[in-house]
């Protein structure tokens, strides 16, 4: 729909991602909670979202201005412990996680704690948590498109909302990954024309992981002669640019200033996204 010009030229994008109190909290139990290990969720998690944005917009990110804070996890808890198995507050902690109910995790993680000290059921309220749990950014692309992005890590549901604003209309989607409101087997797009009626478009769920993307990715890698009509095959450059948006966001928060992607590495943002299929 976007490439077909249904909403004209894209001028801006609204993109908001929600991690629920299970998936989102899990990053604060594990090594991801330390910015020196994960680079923060700007890099470890949001880079996947920026990769999507770069592909959808078909241009390279040029500059980033960001805000972020730690409002819910870490030091904000009223009680804490080293990990859930040793915690005296399990009866009143809504984030209590009983790893002993998962034998695979007991064998993989708990049995090896004596070697590396890694706690898979770490407390989400540990004082050493130093990553953000609330983030927002304004991203400007080389072709002039502006993006308003946010990531919340303690939402009651999982999924994302996205809207593309164009010169001829608007395309919206609400992808409910934890399906809190219905039992339907499809995602729905809504196409608004500036001077016309709205259209509802149903997209059936994919049968493999990540919305059906896992099967497509494996086919691209392992099956010879697979075509790539939508230019979904990503290069090292694509991966670097996705990470660089997160790094720029982190630097922007630290300095209080917008950060240009070109100032971070030798990669120069292009108005038209480069397509490099290397298999």
PLM regions with names:
Residues 94-95, 99-148, 153-157:
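Contiguous C-terminal substrate-recognition/catalytic subdomains in enzyme active sites
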């Amino acid at each position: 729909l976007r490439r077909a010009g249904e909403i004209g030229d894209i001028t801006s994008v609204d993109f908001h991602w929600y991690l629920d109190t299970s998936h989102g909290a899990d990053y604060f139990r594990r090594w991801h909670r330390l910015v020196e290990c994960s680079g923060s969720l700007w890099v470890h998690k949001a880079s996947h979202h920026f990769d999507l944005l770069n592909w959808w917009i078909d241009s390279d990110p040029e500059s980033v201005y960001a805000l972020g804070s730690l409002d819910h996890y870490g030091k904000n808890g009223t009680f804490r412990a080293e990990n859930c198995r040793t915690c005296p507050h399990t009866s009143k902690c809504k984030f209590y996680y009983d790893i002993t109910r998962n034998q695979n995790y007991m064998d993989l993680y708990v049995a090896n704690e004596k070697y590396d000290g890694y706690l898979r059921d770490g407390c989400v309220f540990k004082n050493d948590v130093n990553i953000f749990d609330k983030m927002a950014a304004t991203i400007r692309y080389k072709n002039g498109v502006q993006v308003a992005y946010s990531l919340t890590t303690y939402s009651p549901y999982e999924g994302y909302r996205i809207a593309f604003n164009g010169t001829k209309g608007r395309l919206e989607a609400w992808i409910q990954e934890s399906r809190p409101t219905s039992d339907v087997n499809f995602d729905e797009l809504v196409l608004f024309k500036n001077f016309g009626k709205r259209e509802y478009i149903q997209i059936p769920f994919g049968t493999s992981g990540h919305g059906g993307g896992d099967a497509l990715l494996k086919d691209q890698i392992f099956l010879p002669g697979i075509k790539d009509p939508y230019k979904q095959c990503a290069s090292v450059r694509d991966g670097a640019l996705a990470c660089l948006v997160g790094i720029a966001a982190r630097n922007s928060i630290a300095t209080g200033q917008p950060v240009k992607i070109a100032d971070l590495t030798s990669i120069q943002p292009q108005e038209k996204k480069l397509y490099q299929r290397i298999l």
